[in-house]
Amino acid sequence: MEKCEGIVIRQTSYRESDKIVRMYTREFGKIGVVARGAKKTKSRLAAVTQLFTNGYFTFFGGNGLGTLQQGEVIETFSSIQQDIFMTAYATYVCELLDKATEERQPNPYLYELTFQILRDIDEGYDPQILTQIYEMKMLPVLGLYPTMDKCAICGETTGHFDFSTSSNGIICHRCFEKDRYRMHLPENVVKLLRLFFIFQLDRLGNIDVKQETKDWLQKAIDTYYDEYSGLYLKSRKFIREMDKWENMLKKDSDD
């Protein structure tokens, strides 16, 4: 019998009334368990196995899937559950975590980061910015280490910088001619990318960013992920389509 604190990051139906639940836990990293009878509304496991739920779990372990015995809800993130936009971003966070990690490789920092991101989304902070911070923080988990504290080519720490996927990081104006395909980013966008990658989430505070800046950030992050991560995430595609519709609606209302 094992006990842990975890977040439900994925659930799938299994047989008539059971679920297979994927959790990211503080103690064990990512684990999978069978929750017997959890699809029944009166089941004692129904609430604690809902997507995004943070709770205490007791389970029988094994080489494959464990068997969930009981759970206690700590936090349900109810605002996320009730808002389609919050749900979309939270789903992407969980899918990225699922695809980027292996079974039973504990990473308490990553657990805490994921909890903080979901909590802040639930509390109404900008989900797009929070997700972009999470994407940058997940790069080392994927084995990706872009040079963000100095020029990736010459090592200079001062000057104007652009972002270069081919050089795996930022490059200074002295080296611009060495990469004519670099991304020409506004200075504040480069600064934010560096902050997102280097600083802890609690040091960043509540960041108020214009939509144009968020669009630049997303373009840079998406380009880097497409080049290096090897991941295809359905939830990311859905968010991008959702953002397009939201921007179109805003434009129509402004007109």
Swiss-Prot record:
**Which key words are in the record?**
DNA damage, DNA recombination, DNA repair
Residues making up the signal peptide according to the UniProt record? none
Entry GO CC: bacterial nucleoid
Sorted alphabetically, the Gene Ontology BP terms of this entry are: DNA recombination; double-strand break repair
Cite a single Pfam family from the UniProt record.
RecO_N
SUPFAM superfamilies named among the record's database cross-references:
ArfGap/RecO-like zinc finger, Nucleic acid-binding proteins
Gene3D superfamilies in the cross-refs: Nucleic acid-binding proteins, Recombination protein O, C-terminal domain
The record's section on InterPro entries has: ARFGAP/RecO (IPR037278), DNA_rep/recomb_RecO_N (IPR022572), NA-bd_OB-fold (IPR012340), RecO (IPR003717), RecO_C (IPR042242)
Instruction: Name the family.
Output: Belongs to the RecO family.
Q: Which PANTHER family match?
A: DNA REPAIR PROTEIN RECO
Functional description taken from the UniProt entry: Involved in DNA repair and RecF pathway recombination.
Report the protein name in the record.
DNA repair protein RecO
User: What organism does the UniProt record list as the source?
Assistant: Listeria monocytogenes serovar 1/2a (strain ATCC BAA-679 / EGD-e)
